[in-house]
Amino acid sequence: MNLVICHTHWDREWFAPSSITNEWLKELFERLLDLISRKEDYRYVLDGQTLILEDLLSLAPEFEEKVKGLVQSGNLLIGPLYAQIDFRLSPEPAIVKNIEFGKKDVKEYGGDASVAWMVDNFGFISQLPQLFKRYGIEGAFLWRGVKLEKPSIEFLWESKDGSYVKCIFLIGGYRNLYGLSRTRDLAKKRLKHEIEKLKIFSLSGLVPLLDGYDLDVEPEDPRDLLNEEIELSSAGKYLNEAFSKTEEVPKVNGELLSGKYACVFPGTLSTRVYLKRQAYVVGKMLRYVELLASFRNERIDELYRTYLKTLVHDNICGVGVDTIHRNMRAVYKKLFGALEKSFKEHLKKLATHLKSGLYAVSFSPFEYDHYHCDGERCYRLQSEGVGLFKVNEFDRARSDETLSFKNDYYEAFFNQDGSLNVNRIVTGVLQLERELGDCYSTDTEKMDFSCHISKMQVESVGQRHKIVLLERVIEAEGIHIETKETIIFDESPLVKWNMTVHSCGKDYLLSFVTKSFEGTSKVFAKMPFDVVERDRIDTDLLPHDAGEKLNSVLLAAREVGSIRKFPFQGFVALQGEKTLAVMAKGVHQYEVDEEGDIKIDLIRSVEWIAKNNVKGRTGDAGPLMYVPDARCEGVIDFELAICELNADVRSEEFFKWFSLFDDPPTLVSVNKQDDRGLESLKFFSGSLPWVCVENGELLVYNPYSKPIHGLKPSQMSTILVNVVFPNSGDDRADVEILGSLRFPQLAFKKITERELEQLKEKIEIVEEEIEQVEQTLKGLRKDSYEYHVNMHKLLSEKRTLLELTVSLALNRGKVPKRLMRKLNELRAKRRIYDYIVELLKEGAR
């Protein structure tokens, strides 16, 4: 029997904001209720996320009981995730909360979900199978990211600890039977054609047949057209049947980040970097506040849910219209304000147990005893893990105008171009390239540019620290960039490099380059719950012409040529005789070339969501919509560090210093009327990185190459943190935060009237092209293959026209509801035609 899964893929914010798409949800559910009332055995997969229901009920709470009834009867299949986040860009706690909240929601609605439905996420992290197992998720349906030498619909996906999940690879995409009711005469031919195309990739004999599409509000029952030839299924039922019919299936280990069969869009790692920077800071504050709140049995779930909505793949990847991303900035600012207030309130409560004085609030589990400089002050940090620790000693000022520094870990001196020699390497080199890509994909070429110093001077110096101010100007044709940089030296092995970049111009890539002169060292990158080893270049991709069998199923965009840009969260390291790491906060795209240059991509300036004919990508990626905010013209802050150690990248010694960079101490002043109290409050310590609070305990994992504290390498577990607060004589304390996480401020240029005129000119060109195709169609027989090819072209041109028209309205400050709905309908019609043309191509041969 042929199993068909009916579903929708709900891009709640992409070419239209959720304020618009939420209105469409009501329409979807009205139709679903009607369909199920007529066909009680109908099943519908709600995109594997419970956020859709949250959105629906926020607008139409009267649906709640009906929805619960559908879930409990098995007609509506929800979860197990809360939202379809981007796993490459989301921080560790958010990834955990996304599963936790999803499973909780499913339970509250009376459902059950043990198979993840992730049909359009832009790749997956290595430890997801282990996380899924922790939450009772046994399988997954995937499309993007899969890297199999020989494609197979059924495979096992394994984490480093040995945990695995059963997977269904949707090699033909998630919409191969979509819109049968709109192609009634071809319905049975489409079914037969899809089965014929896909069965060669199936080990079980079953092929995934999916009736659904993006923002589909018209659910259909394919049995009306295909009768007894098919049976409606669910993700769980399909998975069980497929694996019951197979004895041996291929196993894939680790990350799924390949664009071999479907794009994972590496360019999205650096699109609208200002969003990534703000998301990082808000994510850190959530983690800190949740920990402090847990000591008093308080939860911050609603704040986390608001945050998770910004991590949905189209949102955090920056591939939506400007309206959406401007709203994200407002959400981040509001979240940060609420968290900052809560953070201070929790510190005030903790401060009642302390004496008056200065304290370092530490969120790193490691112990430190060295002079630490935060860019304003240099003090002796004596911490014993996570807690509050008294600060008694500050560095003494001295006179020294030399642009060099030496400690137990390195010798450093500045060069005339503003770059810095640190032992054997050169860092702080700024590189500018011409960017030819779009919001989805990066394509760069060399360009002529100049970089000169406008200021370089010592700002502060002591016995144990030095702060150097550096200002540079970068210029190229149509581009002007000014930087204000603060380079911080202290007793640690970290050289901290903070930058404020003021940019004007477009279509460029600005990178922070560290020259290691190591052409053969191994490359490692910090990713959620793991340190992964990667090749410098990924060439395991298919050519433009993948051959007849693959061409017939790979109808969507995929990467071709080679991939040089990869994701990271925290650091990129080269390991040879020593470990050299470049660390960054809220910046996620890197490249390591054949000579050993580590490039951290800071700003990638583009102005279209998706363009045609971007090098390195084949197929249709997304809408041709003008998004001037993606040029990143304005002011953006960055925080980086360079560290070289005689230690393995997967060692406690290395993570001790990375943790200091990623979770630096916050200096606070405590003032009480009496002087009773402690000089420290220690919550916990150790060498295992902690993630978040999970069911009242602390989730930790072992990133090291050897067992530690009873955990095998790569294994996750929880530890109980028992914090007992002593009685204090004074229940009031004033707290002043002297140095904390700073919210990245942004200021962008407004669109000009000339740019709007250029957009109108593009619209006129497309209108002329539409007229030409319509004339061609008049001379063709409607039953000919050429007619359908040209009809496909006409639908593509009309879609482009609507995309540009919606862009024009949005850039004039309007939200064109009617046009957005029309665009959604035209996108669906055009997508159906992909399969019609491919089907008829077989007959034309």
Residue ranges and their predicted role:
Residues I95-R134, K192-L210:
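CE4/NodB-like, metal-dependent polysaccharide N-deacetylase domain
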Residues C6, I36, Y44-D55, L59, ...:
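C-terminal domain-boundary segment and adjacent tail
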Residues M1-P93, K97, V106-K107, R134-I137:
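N-terminal catalytic cores of secreted or lumenal carbohydrate-active enzymes
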Residues D86-D105, G173-L198:
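Alpha-helical scaffold elements lining the catalytic groove of polysaccharide deacetylases
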Residues L28-R31, S58-L70, K97-N98, L148-D161, ...:
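Alpha-helical scaffolding within the catalytic cores
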Residues L33-I36, L225-Q775, S807-A809, V815-L826, ...:
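Terminal accessory/anchoring regions of large secretory-pathway or extracellular enzymes
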Residues V67-K68, S126-L177:
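Surface-exposed loop and adjacent secondary-structure segments within mature catalytic domains
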